[in-house]
Amino acid sequence: MDQVYNIVMAYILTLIISPLYSYLIGSLNASIILSLVFKKQDVRLFASKNAGMTNMIRVHGKKLGILTLFLDIIKPITTVSLTYIIYKYALDAPFDLSNGFNQAILVYFGGIFTIIGHCYPIFFKFQGGKGVACYGGFLITVDPIVALIGIITLLVILLITKYMSLSAMITATFTCFLVLVPGINYIPYYNQNFTTYFFDLNYVIKGIWYVWFFLLVSASLLIYRHKTNILSIATKQERKTILFHTKSKDNLSDVNK
């Protein structure tokens, strides 16, 4: 009976409760909060008017910009990890024997809502960032190996194109599908035993389609949030970024975070 209760509660946790608190935590937009606390100004009123790292650097400097990046990355790591801790220690990591489904994979579901909260924060009139750093944090929890490849990919594309927005969109799309490649799709909270991971790829495949879908939704939202950047790139009006310095022209649309 306890096992059945834990299984039911695990579904309620991962599909209802986790998305709720993940969205609320995601809505705590670091750039807006930091700019209001330390500068008494809303970063969304200046420059690109975007609530993200790049605009924070442009408006308030590198220190607050880097702190914004760190806090945005931490948000999905916190929400997914919190869900996993509750799932494992409070509910004793139940396994739905009725269909052979390992519910551990569902702890990642809330990560999507962290990104949604960041982009559409309830605390700030649903006007948030574009989800790049949050997507990166989510990817770290889903697959650290692919996340590392993603960081390298982002930097290489940025060095070549000088467009942060384009680099972010390409990297998100690339990493989303890269998790499907056997051998590098290690999912920490699902494949808990790293030493046996490579000897049971069939087990990996059972869960990878779920996280792939979660990442696909997240990457699609990220790209959608960059719709103005896509237009700016097409008309050659997008701002160019050189690491933490930006080249700008008058009346250009926002870059990305």
From Swiss-Prot:
The protein's Enzyme Commission number: 2.3.1.275
GO cellular component: plasma membrane
Major localization listed first in the record, in broad terms: membrane
Molecular functions (GO terms): acyl-phosphate glycerol-3-phosphate acyltransferase activity
Reaction(s) catalysed by this chain's protein: an acyl phosphate + sn-glycerol 3-phosphate = a 1-acyl-sn-glycero-3-phosphate + phosphate
Keywords attached to this entry: Cell membrane, Lipid biosynthesis, Lipid metabolism, Membrane, Phospholipid biosynthesis, Phospholipid metabolism, Transferase, Transmembrane, Transmembrane helix
Biological process, per Gene Ontology: phospholipid biosynthetic process
Membrane-crossing segments per the record: 7-27, 66-86, 104-124, 140-160, 164-184, 203-223
Pfam families (UniProt xref): G3P_acyltransf
Pathway per the UniProt entry: Lipid metabolism; phospholipid metabolism
SMART domains: G3P_acyltransf
Protein origin, superkingdom: Bacteria
Locations listed in the record: Cell membrane
Membrane topology field: Multi-pass membrane protein
HAMAP family the record matches: PlsY
Family recorded in the similarity comment: Belongs to the PlsY family.
Subunit structure: Probably interacts with PlsX.
Cited function: Catalyzes the transfer of an acyl group from acyl-phosphate (acyl-PO(4)) to glycerol-3-phosphate (G3P) to form lysophosphatidic acid (LPA). This enzyme utilizes acyl-phosphate as fatty acyl donor, but not acyl-CoA or acyl-ACP.
UniProt xrefs under NCBIfam families: glycerol-3-phosphate 1-O-acyltransferase PlsY (TIGR00023)
Protein name: Glycerol-3-phosphate acyltransferase
Lineage: Bacteria, Bacillati, Mycoplasmatota, Mycoplasmoidales, Mycoplasmoidaceae
Gene: plsY
